[in-house]
Amino acid sequence: MFCAHLDGSPNVIGYYALQLGTDSVSELPDANKDNYLKNYVAFPALNLSFVAVDEQFQRQGLGGHLLMDVFARAAAISEHAGFYALTLTSMNADSTAFYESLNFRIYSENTKFPKMLYPLEDILTLVGAN
């Protein structure tokens, strides 16, 4: 669990948690299946399990800052553990729109709680690790 605080305050104003795991290749759109993934039933993923911003700090850019920290941490984790993409499950239309604005892509057919991903290759380019 990674927490954001205001300087000098013990109060948490935002947080996130990451978890290594797998997800089903069959849910990926064909455009996301490269030759490597076609040979497997699951793809390795770094899942953004939890992310939240305190209500009084929402819509002030903190979520974007947290996600940039997630991307930097994902790049660092990729030096020690292999995975195809950063994944998450969006919980509502507002969060889906937020993640799409950061270039996450929906890869499941569940329209209420869509699964979204950001390929590691794109993360490495974004943080300048390529």
Regions found by a protein language model. Give the residues of each.
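Cytosolic beta-strand hydrophobic patch enriched in CBS
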Residues: M1-D7
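Glycine-rich acetyl-CoA-binding "A-motif" of GNAT/NAT acetyltransferases
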Residues: S9-G14
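Conserved acyl-donor/pantetheine-binding loop and adjacent beta-alpha core of acyl/acetyltransferases
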Residues: Y15-F50
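A short, internal acetyl-CoA/4′-phosphopantetheine-binding micro-motif in the GNAT/acyltransferase core
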Residues: S49-R59
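Conserved acetyl-CoA-binding loop-helix of GNAT-fold acetyltransferases
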Residues: R59-R73, S101
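Short glycine/proline-centered loop/turn elements that form peptide/ligand docking sites
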Residues: L67, N92-S95, E109-P119
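Conserved active-site alpha-helix within GNAT-family acetyltransferase domains
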Residues: A75, A81, L88-E109
